[in-house]
């Protein structure tokens, strides 16, 4: 696992999700009598017994309203810490969450409820929260570029709150979520540990806020899709079944993404996104300007001629090799000499550096439409991602202002937005003994045990972190039945990993999710 991938993708872990589903759950907090909620407001969490004089801080509850489509949405926001206890009742960690419930709902326990988180591992939920789903969003330029400071937070006319209540979860080591003691980090920092603690949070929330009978949805982005897949299998084993799972920029089978010796699959699956990126930056010939035809042509050749050539390896004849070099150069915009030196195999870090080298620019990884400069024009790869650099400052500034001034949650602790909460090497990836991790197995398991579950998968055409063709490959190799495939919906967008930073893609994502949720509730 390269450092470049460290904050968005899991390393080579080997995790049997079915085994994860059978790990013992944490001790439930002592039972308490639930209070009756005031009219049109969610119930307050029941008072929970504490142990060893460790008191829980009550969540902060505030009232708000926004304008959406000419209508006023009035809602209640709750921000606070959910304690995670051990079998003795001691608090071992606190998970920070922000929840939004629409006011004026007669049967709240029947209103849909969606749990949301981002990825990393090490990323807080701020990206989906203030980018796509929540009632407020960070205002970017129309194509997703960073605006000039000071940044703005505006009403999100594309919020999902009109259809579902929302809960944003920051796993331990992200946001304000912390282990109670440093030595307890190991109980939360790991693939299995993370699934268990987030699963325990969901169980606790359903109980404390009396939402056990609500239709349930789960949405994750990037490594959050890995977590969501694991949770779908883990929680169904504990009696919690979801109506729908939404995967944004997904990675389930890591064999499709990891450029390691002997694994040619990523080179094949990245190629359509390389071509799309080269098209965007005007690196392709005049006869390749129809983007839809270009993608279809490259997908077809990548799956056939290119895959066959890589399978032949050193057995390729000189003529065969030259033909592949010609085709790769045509589709990627890279020189034939460079492709030859790369042995027909271009990984993402080298592609992002080489494509625009003649312009002294590098292209983005999370969103390959973005460009930037770096300090080493002669370097083989770039040291930063210009798309992340454009997104991070506005989201960091606006969240820290928003959580204090609008949600009323004040803390001197640093809110870990992306990294900083733990060392990457402290994450427990599990025993690497069975090859690449493939959490699609957990999702398949959930489909088998919950035949009513629906799946939505959204991908950006300019995402070089989780390329759309790799996602297609994974979905087509899950072993789903024809009927199960009918429960899968796909969405594609003309942007990158965080497709919602682009106004047009944000609107389309909202339409797609709205239709998906309506179908999942039938």
Tell what function each PLM region has.
Residues 496-505:
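Catalytic histidine-centered segment of alpha/beta-hydrolase-like enzymes
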Residues 210-222:
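Alpha/beta-hydrolase fold nucleophile elbow
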């Amino acid at each position: 696992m390269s450092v470049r991938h460290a904050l968005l993708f899991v390393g080579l872990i080997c995790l049997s999700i079915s085994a994860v589903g059978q790990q013992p759950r944490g001790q439930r907090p002592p039972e308490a009598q639930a209070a009756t909620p005031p009219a049109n407001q969610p119930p307050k969490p029941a008072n929970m017994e504490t142990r060893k004089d460790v008191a829980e801080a009550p969540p902060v509850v505030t009232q708000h309203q926004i304008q959406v489509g000419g209508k006023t949405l009035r809602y209640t926001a709750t921000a606070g810490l959910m304690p995670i206890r051990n079998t003795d009742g001691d608090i071992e960690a606190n998970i920070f969450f922000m929840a939004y419930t629409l006011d004026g709902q007669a049967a709240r326990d029947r209103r849909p409820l969606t749990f949301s988180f981002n990825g990393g591992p090490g990323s807080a939920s701020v990206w989906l929260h203030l980018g796509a789903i929540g009632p407020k969003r960070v205002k970017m330029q129309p194509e997703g570029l960073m605006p000039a400071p000071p940044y703005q937070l505006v009403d999100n006319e594309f919020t999902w709150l009109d259809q579902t209540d929302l809960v944003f979860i920051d796993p331990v080591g992200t946001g304000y979520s912390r282990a109670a003691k440093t030595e307890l980090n190991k109980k939360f920092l790991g693939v299995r540990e993370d699934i268990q603690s987030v699963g325990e949070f969901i169980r606790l929330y359903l109980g404390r806020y009396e939402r056990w009978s609500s239709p349930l949805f789960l949405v994750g982005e990037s490594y959050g899709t890995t977590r969501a897949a694991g949770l779908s299998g883990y929680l169904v084993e504990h009696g919690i079944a979801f109506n729908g799972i939404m995967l944004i920029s997904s990675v389930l089978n890591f064999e499709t993404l990891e450029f390691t010796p002997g694994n040619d699959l990523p080179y094949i699956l990245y190629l359509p996104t390389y071509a799309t990126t080269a098209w965007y930056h005007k690196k392709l010939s005049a006869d390749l300007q129809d983007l839809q035809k270009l993608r279809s042509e490259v997908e077809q050749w990548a799956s056939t001629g290119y895959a066959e050539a890589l399978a032949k390896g050193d057995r390729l004849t000189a003529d065969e090799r030259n033909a592949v070099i010609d085709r790769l150069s045509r589709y990627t915009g890279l020189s034939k000499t460079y492709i030859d030196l790369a042995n027909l195999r271009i990984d993402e870090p080298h592609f992002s550096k080489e494509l625009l080298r003649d312009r002294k620019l590098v292209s983005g990884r999370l969103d390959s439409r973005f460009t930037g400069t770096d300090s080493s024009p002669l370097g083989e790869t770039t040291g930063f991602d210009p798309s992340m650099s454009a997104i991070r400052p506005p989201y960091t500034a606006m969240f820290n202002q928003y959580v204090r001034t609008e949600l009323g949650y004040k803390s001197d602790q640093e809110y870990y937005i992306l990294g900083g909460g733990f060392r990457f090497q402290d994450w427990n990836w599990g025993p690497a003994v069975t090859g690449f991790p493939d959490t699609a197995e957990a999702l398949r398991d959930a489909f088998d045990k919950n035949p009513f579950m629906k799946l939505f998968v959204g991908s950006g055409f300019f995402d070089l972190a989780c390329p759309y063709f790799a996602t297609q490959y994974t979905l087509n190799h899950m072993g789903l039945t024809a009927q199960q495939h009918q429960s899968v919906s796909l969405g594609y967008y003309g942007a990158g990993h965080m497709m919602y930073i682009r106004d047009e893609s944000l609107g389309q994502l909202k339409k797609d999710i709205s239709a998906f949720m309506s179908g999942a509730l039938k």
